[in-house]
Amino acid sequence: MKIGIPKEIKNNENRVGLSPSGVHALVDQGHEVLVETNAGLGSYFEDGDYQEAGAKIVDEQSKAWDVDMVIKVKEPLESEYKFFKEELILFTYLHLANEQKLTQALVDNKVISIAYETVQLPDGSLPLLTPMSEVAGRMSTQVGAEFLQRFNGGMGILLGGIPGVPKGKVTIIGGGQAGTNAAKIALGLGAEVTILDVNPKRLEELEDLFDGRVRTIMSNPLNIEMYVKESDLVIGAVLIPGAKAPNLVTEDMIKEMKDGSVIVDIAIDQGGIFETTDKITTHDNPTYTKHGVVHYAVANMPGAVPRTSTIGLNNATLPYAQLLANKGYREAFKVNHPLSLGLNTFNGHVTNKNVADTFNFEYTSIEDALK
């Protein structure tokens, strides 16, 4: 199979679809890999590293797309839609529930789009989302602490406090991978940490995991309001696979927060959980202030630590990429059901129900689409 690795063009997206070691694994199995020149530079992988791994370096974006399968990190931007073609396998993060134009373009061009974030194991876990959730979760506390500093617009709070001075209060909405990792860093900094989640079993697991060092609270509108207004830092870490994020924190709740407090919306690439995160920000200009509260709404947080992120992502995605390349998508879906759940569009059909419902597209089951 001919596989393309284009350079990411989203603002400050420094990750790359495959590391040289991933390229080597695919080339070793007889596949041809085309890497756009400088695609790996943001992650400190040189063209020469890819050439040594067996890749062919191409000097035009179009050549990296003129392949059987494209492996990326982030969803294609509008300038890349012109490269879509029938039967192209696109393997990347898509977050289509927040991307109507992209969904339409994938359908119109009959692209076989497989979203990392909807590949799902029988236990409900999301193996290709996990590494980036870990990165984003850990980063969310770090950037929150940074923007609590006075010269960054915050109220001048040190999350860990000092003897005789109260600790900063961190509230995390969502106790999944991202929320759990946010809590680990917040605890490490010495903050007072509360996690809200709708799943009582998950709250029990978090109690055990953190040995009672975090406060675990059932997530409902009253509790969210109560804890949000008292917090110095609120982190939104809620995920419904393939669906738009629920709006859990209202504008009125934000108005009750202290001036100079900070919110970090990890879920912004799925629409966000805060009513006031009504725009996506970038690493170049990561925050804005509304009702006195600093809003951080960067959709590609792991792009700021690309070396760690690329290697972690490659570790997770490579076995699935090899399966697709070695067996073809039909056989790969047959032998690996979790991978088949990643299929979002196929031959002009939307095959993810959450995406179809969000934009009123006709839904076609994966089984029916593949007949």
Swiss-Prot record:
Q: Name one GO cellular component term.
A: cytosol
Gene Ontology biological-process entries? alanine catabolic process; L-alanine catabolic process
Q: Report the catalytic activity.
A: L-alanine + NAD(+) + H2O = pyruvate + NH4(+) + NADH + H(+)
**Which residues are the active-site ones?**
95 (proton donor/acceptor), 269 (proton donor/acceptor)
Q: Which UniProt keywords apply?
A: NAD, Nucleotide-binding, Oxidoreductase
Q: Which Pfam families match?
A: AlaDh_PNT_C, AlaDh_PNT_N
For this protein, the Enzyme Commission number is 1.4.1.1
Indicate the enzyme's highest-level EC class. Answer: oxidoreductase
Pathway note: Amino-acid degradation; L-alanine degradation via dehydrogenase pathway; NH(3) and pyruvate from L-alanine: step 1/1
Where NAD(+) binds, per the record, is at 133, 177-178, 197, 219, 238-239, 266-269, 298-301
Q: What are the recorded GO MF terms, alphabetically?
A: alanine dehydrogenase activity; nucleotide binding
* Protein name, as recorded: Alanine dehydrogenase
Q: Which organism is it from?
A: Staphylococcus epidermidis (strain ATCC 35984 / DSM 28319 / BCRC 17069 / CCUG 31568 / BM 3577 / RP62A)
